Design a protein with these regions (language model features):
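Vicinal oxygen chelate
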Residues: 82-120
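Short aromatic/hydrophobic contact patches that present stacked aromatics
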Residues: 7-9, 43, 66-68, 105-107
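N-terminal beta-strand motif that seeds the catalytic metal site of vicinal oxygen chelate
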Residues: 1-19, 67
């Protein structure tokens, strides 16, 4: 058995909140756009990663995921995010911190999900 990718679906009450985090803050690009449709949806892509965003208030209230994005240069990511979108820094992990398991991490959050940025 062989897999190539794991592609998460993320549900938002308002899809523009997800676009602010993933496109404006983290630099993902919109690869497929149905944002202005009756059931807003888009596919975001960056560096071989893919995420599906959906606007669905019912499912958004049922799902609050947390993801980890692994990088080889956490300082670069932190500098960009902390300057451009400090409102996304998670209050419990707002600075790069060496964790007991050996990873360096900081975290982001919007109203729907948490994202831990991690470097091993």
């Amino acid at each position: 058995m062989n897999f190539e990718k794991l592609v998460p679906n993320i549900f938002y009450v308002d899809i523009t909140n997800g676009l602010k985090l993933f496109v404006d803050c983290l630099g993902f690009a919109i690869g497929h756009d149905e944002i202005r449709s009756h059931q807003p949806f888009c596919v975001l892509e960056k560096d071989g990663l893919r995420i599906n965003l959906f606007e669905n208030a019912k499912l958004a209230k049922e799902h609050n995921p947390e993801f980890r994005l692994v990088t080889k240069n956490i300082e670069e990511v932190y500098d960009k995010v902390s300057r451009s979108h400090p409102e996304f820094l998670h209050p419990n992990l707002p600075k790069i911190t060496l964790r007991p398991w050996g990873a360096r991490e900081f975290a982001l959050m919007d109203g729907q999900l948490g994202v831990v940025i991690q470097e091993w």
